[in-house]
C-alpha cells in the first residue's frame, strides 16, 4: 500500500543531483529534501525534517495507489518511481538534475526535471508543489503565466515551467493523465522551446554524461553495481564550482532517536574530503582530486600562517556559526534542526594530515593535467610544520568531542602521515635536503606515538596518549602505513577493538560516555574499517561475510547514512553519508577477486 503523506519519514530515499544542487526523493516519488541554489543552500524542500507540516515537498500523488517501485537507470543518478493504482492504471516519474557538456563547459543548472509518463490505464494524479524558504519561517508569493508558476522568495525566485495545466497545479486538483507531462523547476528564466523537447534533450544528454563517466571507472570485479552506485553518490557530493566535498546532503537527521545528536553536515570536512578523494582516485576518477586541489590551495593561501580549520563552507567560508531553525519540526519531530556547525571552531590536528594525504597523489599520478610540482610542495610544507609542532598536543579529535581535549592517537598519526608523505614527495621531486629533513621529523614522531599511544595494560594502541580507552579509528593504522598489517601490535589492536566495540556484525566508534551520553548506534564507516582490517590480517572469509551483510543493510537503492541500529538495522544520521559510501568502495576493492583471476 502507499505510504500516506502523514507517515513517519525514513531514509529509504533516492538521491538526484548534478554537483550544484541535489534532492532526495521518497519511495512514493515525493521530493522531500533539496537545497537551492547550491548544496548548502536553504532547503526549498524541507519536508524530511518538518514532517509535521504539509509543506516543503513536491509530490505527484496517484489516486487509489496500491504499490510503488523505485530504481535508478543503470549507471546514472536518474531516478524512476513507478506508481500503480487499483484500477490498472500506472505512471512512471523520472527525476534528474541536468549535467552535461555544453558550449565548452559543464552545464549543471539549478534545475530539477520531472517527467511523468503514463504506463497503463488512465491514472488520476494530483501535483502538490509546496516549496519553502527561510528554514520554514519565510513566506512567499506565487505568480503565474500561461505555462509557468513563479515562487517569489526574499532571496531567490523559482519558476516551474510545464506542459501540464497550471490551474490544476495551483489548485492541487486531481487530473486524468491522458499524456505525458514534463515539469521543469529552476531559476526564473523563460523556456523558449517546447518543455517536452527540452526535458527529453536534457535527459538524453545527462544519461550520456553519466554513462561516459562510469565507463572511465576502474571498478573491482565483484560488487560492481554497488561500487558504481557509491561512486556516483560521492561524485554528487562534490561542488563543481569550487571543488569542495560535502560530508552529507542533509542536516539534523539524528544519529540516534531523541539524542540531540543532530548536526548539519552540508559542509566540507577536510578529513571526509580526503577519504572521498582517495576512494575516487582508487577508481580512477582523478577529476575530483584536481578540483579539490584547487579548493585546498585557495584555503591554504587564504589562511593565517597555514593554520587549518577542520571544516569550511563549500565556497571556502570560514565562519559556520551554529544556530537552530525553530520553525522546522525535525526528523520525526526530533529537534533541534541545526544550521551551521560549531565544530569549525575546534582544534583537530588530523586536518593537516588529511590535506597532505589528499594531495599526495598529485605528485605521483602522470594522468593529471597539472601534476604536483615544487611550487605546490612548498605550499604544503607549512602544513607539515604545524603537524610536527602539534602532533603531541591536545585536540578535539576526529569524533569532535565538544567537552574535552586530549592528545588523540589518531590525530598524532595523521600528523605523522603529513610529514611522512612530505618526505616521499620531496624524494619524488629530487629534493634531497627536504627529504632528509622531513624523514627525520617523521621518524621522531613515529617513535613518540609508538610509545605514548600504546598501552601495555591493554596490549593495544589506545585512543589517547596515556589513556586506556579504545577507538575504532585505530583500525586505520595499517592503511596509513604507520604499522604493517602483520605487526603484532596491529593484530592485537584489531582484536582488542573487536572485543570491546563490536556489536553483532557492526562496529561502534567508541563506547565511553561523551558530551551527549553513551553512544547507542554503530558507525557505518567503522564497520568498513573493521572489515578492511580483518582482510589485512588474513581473516578474509570473515571480512567478506561482514561486507555482504553491510551490502544487505543499505537502502533498496544501495545508499547508506552515517549510523545504524545494530539490532534492527535501521539507518540513522545524515544521508547519504560520504564516509559510509567511501567505506563500501574501499572494502569492495580490498575483497574483490582480481579481474585476471575471475574468469
What are these regions (language model features)?
Residues 1-599:
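Acidic, mature catalytic/reactive cores of soluble proteins
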Amino acid at each position: 500500500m502507499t505510504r500516506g503523506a502523514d507517515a513517519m519519514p525514513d531514509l529509504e530515499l533516492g538521491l538526484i543531483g548534478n554537483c550544484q544542487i541535489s534532492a532526495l526523493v521518497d519511495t512514493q516519488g515525493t521530493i522531500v529534501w533539496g537545497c537551492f541554489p547550491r548544496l548548502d543552500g536553504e532547503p526549498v524542500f524541507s519536508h524530511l525534517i518538518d514532517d509535521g507540516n504539509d509543506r516543503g515537498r513536491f509530490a505527484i500523488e496517484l489516486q487509489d495507489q496500491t504499490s510503488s517501485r523505485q530504481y535508478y537507470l543503470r549507471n546514472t543518478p536518474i531516478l524512476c518511481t513507478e506508481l500503480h493504482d487499483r484500477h490498472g492504471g500506472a505512471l512512471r516519474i523520472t527525476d534528474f538534475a541536468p549535467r552535461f557538456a555544453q558550449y565548452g563547459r559543464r552545464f549543471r543548472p539549478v534545475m530539477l526535471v520531472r517527467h511523468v509518463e503514463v504506463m497503463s490505464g488512465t491514472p488520476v494524479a494530483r501535483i502538490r508543489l509546496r516549496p519553502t524558504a527561510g528554514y520554514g519561517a519565510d513566506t512567499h508569493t506565487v505568480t503565474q503565466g500561461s505555462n509557468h508558476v513563479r515562487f517569489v522568495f526574499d532571496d531567490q525566485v523559482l519558476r516551474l515551467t510545464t506542459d501540464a495545466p497550471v490551474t490544476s497545479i495551483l489548485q492541487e486538483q486531481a487530473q486524468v493523465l491522458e499524456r505525458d507531462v514534463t515539469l521543469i523547476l529552476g531559476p526564473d528564466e523563460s523556456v523558449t522551446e517546447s518543455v517536452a523537447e527540452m526535458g527529453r534533450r536534457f535527459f538524453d544528454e545527462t544519461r550520456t554524461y553519466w554513462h561516459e563517466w562510469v565507463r572511465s571507472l576502474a571498478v573491482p570485479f565483484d560488487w560492481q553495481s554497488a561500487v558504481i552506485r557509491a561512486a556516483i553518490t560521492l561524485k554528487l557530493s562534490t561542488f563543481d564550482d569550487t571543488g569542495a566535498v560535502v560530508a552529507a546532503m542533509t542536516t539534523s537527521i539524528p544519529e540516534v532517536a531523541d539524542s540531540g545528536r543532530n548536526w548539519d553536515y552540508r559542509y566540507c570536512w577536510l578529513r571526509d574530503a580526503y577519504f572521498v578523494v582517495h576512494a575516487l582516485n582508487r577508481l580512477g576518477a582523478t577529476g575530483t582530486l584536481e578540483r579539490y586541489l584547487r579548493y585546498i590551495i585557495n584555503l591554504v593561501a587564504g589562511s593565517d600562517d597555514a593554520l587549518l580549520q577542520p571544516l569550511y563552507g563549500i565556497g571556502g567560508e570560514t565562519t559556520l556559526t551554529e544556530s537552530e531553525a525553530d520553525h522546522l519540526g525535525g526528523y520525526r519531530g526530533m529537534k533541534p534542526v541545526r544550521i551551521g556547525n560549531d565544530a569549525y571552531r575546534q582544534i583537530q590536528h588530523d586536518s593537516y594530515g588529511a590535506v597532505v594525504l589528499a594531495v599526495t597523489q598529485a605528485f605521483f599520478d602522470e594522468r593529471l593535467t597539472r601534476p604536483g610540482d615544487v611550487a605546490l610542495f612548498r605550499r604544503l610544507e607549512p602544513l607539515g610544520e604545524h603537524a610536527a609542532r602539534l602532533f603531541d598536543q591536545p585536540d578535539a579529535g576526529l569524533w569532535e568531542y565538544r567537552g574535552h581535549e586530549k592528545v588523540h592517537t589518531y590525530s598524532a598519526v595523521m600528523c605523522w602521515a603529513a610529514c611522512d608523505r612530505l618526505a616521499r614527495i620531496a624524494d619524488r621531486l629530487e629534493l634531497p635536503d627536504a627529504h632528509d629533513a622531513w624523514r627525520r621529523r617523521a621518524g621522531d614522531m613515529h617513535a613518540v606515538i609508538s610509545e605514548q599511544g600504546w598501552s601495555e595494560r591493554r596490549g593495544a594502541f589506545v585512543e589517547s596518549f596515556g589513556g586506556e580507552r579504545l577507538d575504532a579509528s585505530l583500525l586505520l593504522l595499517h592503511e596509513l602505513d604507520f604499522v604493517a598489517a602483520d605487526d603484532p601490535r596491529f593484530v592485537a589492536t584489531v582484536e582488542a577493538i573487536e572485543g570491546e566495540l563490536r556489536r553483532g556484525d557492526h562496529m561502534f566508534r567508541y563506547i565511553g560516555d561523551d558530551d551527549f551520553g553513551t553512544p547507542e548506534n554503530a558507525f557505518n564507516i567503522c564497520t568498513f574499517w573493521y572489515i578492511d582490517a580483518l582482510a589485512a590480517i588474513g581473516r578474509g572469509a570473515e571480512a567478506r561475510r561482514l561486507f555482504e551483510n553491510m551490502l544487505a543493510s543499505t537502502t533498496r537503492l544501495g545508499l547508506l547514512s552515517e549510523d545504524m541500529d545494530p539490532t534492527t538495522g535501521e539507518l540513522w544520521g545524515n544521508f547519504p553519508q560520504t564516509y559510509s559510501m567511501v567505506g563500501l568502495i574501499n572494502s569492495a576493492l580490498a575483497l574483490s577477486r582480481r579481474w585476471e583471476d575471475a574468469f
